[in-house]
A protein has these predicted regions:
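Active-site beta->alpha loop and helix N-cap motifs at the rims of alpha/beta catalytic domains
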Residues: 2-145
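Catalytic alpha/beta core domains of metabolic enzymes, predominantly
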Residues: 125-127, 141-230
């Protein structure tokens, strides 16, 4: 199973003044973050503005990230959309680009029930049997929570490997860390609660500030893992 550990930047997508993706700058950002000590990357997430990109731009971003990173870090790509069919198309496109670990949020706008959300994730797993899923709970953006009913449904599925928890509800994160510690890797998605997440069992931080405070974030994690909490 892929291990999510340490600082995983939620990669920004750099644009030039004309609104085109600046792939050279993307490569420079990745190299800078690797030198600072990050352990992997998450392209095409919320911070990467996947919703503002064409499919061709998404494919090129995936290719650029994979080419630059190589075997120097874990890669988890966002693959999201407003309905199950669209997400499956994004999943297959992402898989074809060489990614096997995908960050998948609930479909936005449709507001599925928890049972429908279980069906959504199961359809994705069935359509792409060679990928792993990182659940993405960000209800302020999707208006749908990846609830405990969903976590219960997939807790024994070895291909649903983790959850990025971005609700901002620390008590929920603590409950996930306690109740599902043997089922899911917990990744912090609430940047202002990173230390709390690590103290309560998170193994990684999918981190927006790593795009602008890279060394500080990596130093924070290094001090935490060495026991220096001062």
């Amino acid at each position: 199973m892929t291990q999510l550990k340490g600082i995983l930047p939620a990669l920004v997508t750099p644009f030039d003044k004309a609104g085109n993706v600046n792939y050279d700058m993307l490569g420079n950002i990745i190299e800078f973050q690797l030198k600072a000590g990050v352990t992997g990357f998450v392209p095409l997430g919320s911070t990467g503005e996947y919703y503002a990109l064409t499919n061709q731009e998404r494919r090129q971003i995936l290719s650029t990230v994979r080419e630059v990173v190589g075997d120097r870090g874990v890669l988890i790509a966002g693959a999201n959309g407003s309905c199950t069919r669209e997400v499956i198309e994004q999943v297959k496109q992402t898989r074809d680009a060489g990614y096997t670990n995908l960050l998948i949020a609930p479909p936005y706008y449709a507001l599925p029930s928890q049972d429908e959300l279980i069906g959504h994730y199961q359809a994705i797993l069935d359509a792409a049997p060679d990928i792993n899923v990182v659940l993405y709970n960000y209800p302020v953006r999707t208006n749908v929570e990846v609830g405990f009913t969903v976590l219960d449904a997939f807790k024994d599925n070895k291909r649903v490997i983790a959850i990025k928890e971005s609700s901002g509800n620390l008590l929920r994160a603590i409950e996930i860390g306690n109740t599902y510690k043997d089922n899911y890797q917990l990744s912090c998605g609430s940047d202002d609660q990173a230390l709390d997440f690590f103290l309560w069992g998170a193994s990684s931080w999918i981190c927006g500030p790593a795009n602008c405070l890279t060394q500080q974030v990596c130093d924070f994690y290094s001090k935490y893992t060495s026991g220096d909490l001062n």
